[in-house]
């Protein structure tokens, strides 16, 4: 009995399991038990519903069988070609580690990236090719603003062939990143130039994920034109519960006829 009047009971938290608990109140008299509220045959239920964030975390854990870490390696590049036959191409590699929190803060991560490229230093048949190089570290964060809205942010610091390199970027995904969605985003790496994309992903042939993108980029520090544009088609496949692979092909140009590019990637979850 409470000192403030009335009666109360405390149930240990570890004794409660979803969807909740049930109780009844009886008293003991000389004639036996007297039911005051509900009964053993018909107890009063108390439902304990998890919050939306808790439910989403449980769904993530069930989908990934409790695996919260991932390591991925991606390699992408494109040859833009040039109407004068000069080389205009880039190759970009990134190694990333991600820890999934699976709450409103969905994941955090860090990684390392490298960019190599050659591009004409001017417009014309006698332009010389300049080399563009960059090495940088990445810090990433993903926020689940809604069950089907994810917002990504990243910062990059490193060095390029011209000195200190800073960068940043962001993206928004409408839908589930691991199923059908539409995403758009951009990033910038100081003197190496900006990149922006719009991508549609669909899962009609699960477990194969397919995607189509439009990408505009100045990589690798293009001097001829800022209109490097290509389309990209990619396929992702989950080989087993812990291993996924990706392949992509791209086609587009900057100054002249279109050329091909592509990419590969691998990710392991643990």
Regions found by a protein language model. Give the residues of each.
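Transmembrane beta-barrel strands of outer-membrane/channel proteins
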Residues: 71-77, 108-116, 153-159, 170, ...
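Glycine- and aromatic-enriched membrane insertion/assembly motifs of diderm outer-membrane
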Residues: 87-157, 169
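Outer-membrane beta-barrel "beta-signal"
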Residues: 258-270
